[in-house]
Every structure is written in C-alpha cells, then in structure tokens.
C-alpha cells in the first residue's frame, strides 16, 4: 500500500501541510503505524522537486518506509483561462540529486510535467547511480 499525500506550502513559505492540516511528520508516523509499504507525496501548492526533497527528508527522519516523490512542475499561472506550468524540465531535474540524497527511492512527477520532464528526471537519476 502506498500512502501518498498532497501538501501545500504555507503563506510564509516555512512549512508544508495537507489541506486538512496534516504535517509530513504526522503523515510519516501514521503511515508506518497503519502498515503502509511506501510513504509518498504528490502535487500541492508550492510542491516542486525542491519542496519534495525537503518533505522526503522529513519522511526519512520520522519513519523507516521507502519514500516516493511525485511533485509538480512548479506553480501554474493562468493564461487565457488555462493553467500553464512554466518550470522547464532542466529546472525540475536540477533538484533530483537533493531528493535522492534526502532519501527518495522512487521519483516521478505530477501536474504540469511532460515527457521531457520525465526524461530529464531519469537522466539525473541515472547520473546519480553512476556516481554511486
């Protein structure tokens, strides 16, 4: 079972919580207690790969489960009544080493991501694997 939660960055940019007020610390402890096999994050306001690395570290510090991250490709902007994600694939991928170092065992992507984002993420994962 995968326990995956969407987090929003606080207005002051200092912490992440779900829309119901659950912190990553609480989620990690509860997921492990309930028998989840993987603790994960996806989506959310302000949840890009950099934020995913921060939450992944919190997860690792609060439970022993494998960590999966699937963040957005940045924050969308409204253009002609359409949500447009402007984060470039290289910008998403740049934070992959931090997510791996923080303990992410599985890395994917969510809203706004394109096949090119996925290719760049894979390239960075492969690069990190060659170094280790």
What residue spans do the PLM features occupy?
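Domain-level signal for soluble alpha/beta catalytic cores
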Residues: 1-132
């Amino acid at each position: 079972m995968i326990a995956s939660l969407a987090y929003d960055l606080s207005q002051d940019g200092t912490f992440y919580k779900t829309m119901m007020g659950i912190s990553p610390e609480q989620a990690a402890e509860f997921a492990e207690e309930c028998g989840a096999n993987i603790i994960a994050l996806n989506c959310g306001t302000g949840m890009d790969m950099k934020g995913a690395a921060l939450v992944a570290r919190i997860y690792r510090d609060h439970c022993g489960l494998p960590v999966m991250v699937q963040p957005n490709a940045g924050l969308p902007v409204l253009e002609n009544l359409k949500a447009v994600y402007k984060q470039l694939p290289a910008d998403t991928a740049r934070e992959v080493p931090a997510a791996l170092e923080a303990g992410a065992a599985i890395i994917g992507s969510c809203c706004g991501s394109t096949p090119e984002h996925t290719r760049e993420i894979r390239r960075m994962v492969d690069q990190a694997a060659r170094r280790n």
